[in-house]
């Protein structure tokens, strides 16, 4: 599921960052000792929060491109009934718009999947 993919990514990303703390953006010397470890956790949390927000916006753009662009989503194309396909595309575009314009509304990935379920239920 979407929630599992994000949770695994987040966990593994943090594991790798903690195991290999190298690079110019977050030099190890800045994060030594207990205060440094706390500061690093705070930096990691902030970085992942920004990455998550950006990922939501990117996902919204991809959803729009796959609905309106030339590279259509094959799952939508397989819906033979044009009215049903159009309804699915409208729901997809609605969620995509919200992901782009209101990413802060979705603090955790479960809120994204819950919103998708709400949009589907409202149009049923």
Where do the protein language model's features map onto the residues?
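Active-site Asp-x-Gly
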Residues: 1-11
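Glycine-enriched catalytic-core subsegment of oxygenase/oxidase enzymes
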Residues: 1-2, 15-19
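Short, glycine/acidic-rich hinge or "gate" loops at secondary-structure transitions
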Residues: 18-28
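Regulatory N- and C-terminal appendages and interdomain linkers associated
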Residues: 25, 31-124
């Amino acid at each position: 599921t979407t929630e599992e993919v994000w949770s695994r990514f987040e966990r593994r990303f943090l594991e790798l960052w903690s195991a290999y703390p190298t690079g110019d953006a977050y030099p190890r010397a800045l994060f030594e000792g207990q205060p440094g470890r706390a500061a690093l956790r705070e930096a990691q949390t902030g970085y992942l929060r920004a990455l998550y927000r950006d990922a939501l916006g990117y996902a919204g753009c991809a959803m729009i491109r796959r609905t309106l662009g030339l590279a259509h989503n094959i799952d939508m194309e397989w819906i033979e009934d044009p009215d049903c396909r159009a309804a699915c595309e409208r729901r997809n575009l609605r969620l995509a718009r919200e992901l782009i314009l209101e990413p802060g509304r979705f603090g955790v990935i479960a809120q994204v999947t819950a919103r998708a379920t709400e949009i589907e239920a409202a149009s049923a």
